[in-house]
Amino acid sequence: MRPILLQGHERPLTQLKYNREGDLLFSVARDKTICVWYSHNGERLGTLEGSGGANFSVDADPTTTIVATGSADQTARLWDIKTGKTIHSWNFKTTVKRVEFSPDGTKLIVLSEKMMGYPGGISVFNVKADVNATQETEPIMDIKPEEGADKFSFAVWSYGGKYIITAHADGSLSKYDGATGEFIASTQIHEEKFPITDLQPSPDKTYVITSSKDKTARLTDVDSLKLLKTYKTDTSMNSACITSKKDFVILGGGQDAKDVTTTSSRDGKFEARFYHKIFEDEVGRVKGHFGPLNCVVAHPNGGSYASGGEEGYIRIHHFDPSYFDFTYDVERFAAKE
């Protein structure tokens, strides 16, 4: 499984995102460049220029007509994917840490950071997947954390845009109504005092995976907020994703970036780890990065995955046939019956 190494950023990666078909991979980092890559060979299609600060989030609408980004310049922007030009921007009081289109592409979540005395929160905008359309300037709803809850760290849509699932800095998950923004429920998923470091939905958006500094990744059902599975590791995790074709989850992390100069890559545990989604066993690791993995993302068709590191490199791995042939004995026996 030879990786394709992508060099387009000078600073640590913050998020990777495939479009719905998976032919394009978008990357953002703590620099001003937003890169667009062909996922099958790693060729750079182009860059989106104009951001005024580090970029923390990126997402393409379902038709891959427009792209949304969130940045430290306190803006959320919409871009024309064909020309690379900004077509709209919304200004906020603090850094925009997360953007995500709804499954039908008509709404956009924008999550702003709590800092400098501003509470932050989630704004939901109506958007039009038309580069010539005039976008609405005001959100259709604003969501703030419940009283006593910690700040929002991440937010994703559930299936059909029914819920907005949010992750918090205290290790908890919350659920809000996707149409009204009304609070529904909250639960403690990870250990308290250990922040959630990533939140990604399953391919069908019926459950989510979270990673945390408590050295675990966990699956949670979006309807009940019930904990389904726990994947235990020996180092803090920065990211986790769910593969679509095989029953695996991929975890990425490693020793904190501030400590990496004192350790080798082996001691730092800078590997992508594969766990069986059902049995919770670790089944393999992929090395290559020489710093912590900041983000991992699975290709929509399940044939590859990409990882982004603290060192600024992206690695795309296309799976070998042996990956698809691997099964547990119980899976083989069940298939024969």
Swiss-Prot record:
Localization (cell): Cytoplasm
Keywords for this protein: Cytoplasm, Initiation factor, Protein biosynthesis, Repeat, WD repeat
Gene Ontology annotations of biological process type: cytoplasmic translational initiation; formation of cytoplasmic translation initiation complex
Top-rank lineage group of the source organism: Eukaryota
Keyword Cytoplasm applies: yes
This protein's record includes keyword Magnesium: no
Cross-referenced PROSITE patterns: WD_REPEATS_1, WD_REPEATS_2, WD_REPEATS_REGION
Matching InterPro entries: eIF3i (IPR027525), WD40/YVTN_repeat-like_dom_sf (IPR015943), WD40_repeat_CS (IPR019775), WD40_repeat_dom_sf (IPR036322), WD40_rpt (IPR001680)
GO MF term set: RNA binding; translation initiation factor activity
Signal peptide: none
WD repeats: 8-49, 51-89, 147-186, 191-232, 288-327
One Pfam family this sequence matches: EIF3I
GO cellular component, one term: eukaryotic 48S preinitiation complex
Main location: cytoplasm
Record note on quaternary structure: Component of the eukaryotic translation initiation factor 3 (eIF-3) complex.
Role according to the record: Component of the eukaryotic translation initiation factor 3 (eIF-3) complex, which is involved in protein synthesis of a specialized repertoire of mRNAs and, together with other initiation factors, stimulates binding of mRNA and methionyl-tRNAi to the 40S ribosome. The eIF-3 complex specifically targets and initiates translation of a subset of mRNAs involved in cell proliferation.
Similarity remark: Belongs to the eIF-3 subunit I family.
Official protein name in the record: Eukaryotic translation initiation factor 3 subunit I
